[in-house]
Structures are given as C-alpha cells and as structure tokens.
Amino acid sequence: MKKRLTLLGLLILVVAIPLVIFLTLTYQNVKQKAQALGNVTSRSVIGQIPEEVTAGSLISRNAPAFASSGYYPASNANDDSYDTTWRSQGTPGWLAYDLSNVPTSQRSKVLVVWYNETSNYDHTIIGYNAYNMPQDYTIDINPGDGGGSPPGGGWITVATVKGNHYHSREHVIDMAGNNWIRINVTRVDGSLENYDASINMDVYDATYGIADNWIFFGDSITAGGMGHATTGGVKAFAQLINARAPKYFPAQESGGIGYLTSADGVKYINMWLKLFPGKYVALSYGTNDANGCVDADNFYNNYVSLVQAVLNAGKIPVIPHIPWARTANVQHCGPMLNARIDTLYKAFPQIIKGPDLWAFFQGNQNLISNDNLHPTDTGFGAYRQQWANAMLTTVYKTKV
C-alpha cells in the first residue's frame, strides 16, 4: 500500500512540476505583453519595440486633407514628403483630415503630432525668431460623415494650447465615434511676413499605446540633424526606419536647441518631458561642453540627472558619444567626456547606446564644416543616418 502511494506521489510530482513551470512562464509572458500594451512608458518595458506596433499605426498618410485657406495646399501636410508643408493665408486657419476610411478600430484613440520648420525646439531660450509656428490652437474632432467636404459645424474641442513656443507638439486624443480631426490655429509666432501657420501633421493609431515614439534632445547639431526636412539627401529619421523596417514608422520630434550644454538640459528636462507622451528620449549634449572644456565630473553629474529624470518619467534614455570635431578644445576634452558617457552606460544599464559619433566623424573628417565644429549639409545627413543605423540594429532588430 505504501509503495503504491509512493508511486502515485511521484506520478503527481512528474505531472505537477512541469505544469507549474508552464503556468508561471505563461503568466509572465501575458503580464509582459499587457505592460507593453497598457503602459508603454513603464520602467519595466525593455528597449525593443513591441510587436503590436506596426507601420500601419500611421493612419493619416495621404488621407483626404482640407484647409480653410493656403499658400500651400492641405495635402502637403500629410503627403509622402516632409519637405512640403501646408501653409495658411493668415490666421485663424485650420487643417482637417477625413479619417472615415480608416478602420474604426485604428482610430478610437490617436496620437496627433504636428511639425513646424522653425529650427530650434524652443526658440525663446536663445532668442531666435520662429517661422510660421502655431502659438494658440485647438485640436478638434467631428462625427460628421466622411467622403466629402469638412463639416460646417459640430466640432468638438479636445485639446487647447495657448502661448506655445515649441516647434512640434504631440496630443493623445480619444477619437471614438468621430471621423474628422483638425488643428485650428488662431495665433502664430513668427517674424515679418512669416505669420501664417505652416506645418506637417501626422495622426497615429494609439490603441496599443505610443511605444514607437522618439524625441531627440540636444544642441545645434541635433537641431540640424534630426529635423524632418531632407538634409544632405537623407530623409527624416522616421522615414529611414520605415525604409529598412517597413513594419514601423515612428513618431519623431527634434528637441535640439543651439548653444545648449548638459547643464542647460538639466534645467529644462523635466518641463520638456511633461510635454512628450512617448517612450524613447535621446540625450545628445556634449559638443558645447567639450568645446568649453567643462569639468568632467560636472558633465557626468549633469548626465546622471538627465538619465534619472527620463527614468523617473517612465521613459527610456538613449545616449550617443559626443561627435568628433576639429576644434582644439573638442579634441582635447571630448575623449574625457566620452569616457564619462562610457561610465554612464555601466552605471545605468537601462540606457540604450546611441551611435558612436566620435568614431564616425573622426573617420570622416571631410563631413565637418569650415567652422570646425558643425557637420556640413552632407554631414548632417550622415549624422541622421548614423542614428537610424544604430537604432535599427539595437531597437528594431533589423540588419543595416
């Protein structure tokens, strides 16, 4: 009898242990997928893009576009090129998309992103002028039937912005039950003869969150390299990703501002992060630090503060090496600061390593302009390509 019970017990253990392991692994897998879908900015989310995010998430490309007026047509705002924009004839002026042909399952919640050609992310910090940049505006939706002209009434305002001083903004909008979406600009920030609204505008399916979304903070090199217009024959970062990994088409903002150092980044980072609902935050400060030969310990501590701010916001920091340049200070101090970035990688394993811009430009010195600091136009295009290549390999798991 005892022998029979012993055999029965062993049989139960043989069956039960694998079952427990299977159930545990299944639960963990489901939990991870739920986190990726339901909380894409969770600190527990790994660096790779969730499989659920696809290029189909960009739902506004070539959708019927309409505008109140325009020096340039509404269709310029959502065509295949970021080199073209819609430009109003004065303000108020609106730009509307008919999304009625998009499956309703892909537009119950959307991400609206608009981009303006003003070079600096926040031009007020360094006193530069804006260029036809929306300052006061609303995002509106409408349940009216699609397939024709925009509705004359019944617009529902779902986001209101006043006093904007950024050249791009993002808004997560609940659009369930609606077919139309528009931006209505009532005031513009610009200079003489540049007081029209001029933008590109993308709309993404945000049903599964907004994991495939990037912002690149940095200095004038970031500003020159990570905008949307073609630079040095190279298209925008998002288009480069899509060209090599057609499943994806990331939302992307350039957060570059001329003259800024890592200390300036620390000053503004928390304010900026509140505006950015996405996942990946590139931190590309250091050229101005190196050119001023700042104390390496201070530089490192600034970056620690930046990384902690990004992690505390539930996002993922992405950090490259400082680019090589010809100035004596950068050549002398740059390696010391890049060594601190290497230390940062070890201290914070959550960091995704960006491109080694020092090695690249040191090996391609002809891509540095006559000011000995900034890339040439072709160099800016190469800078952008280096970013895309690095992220294709690291994040999108695509060979380049």
Which residues are covered by each model-predicted region?
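Sec-dependent signal peptide cleavage junction
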Residues: 19-39
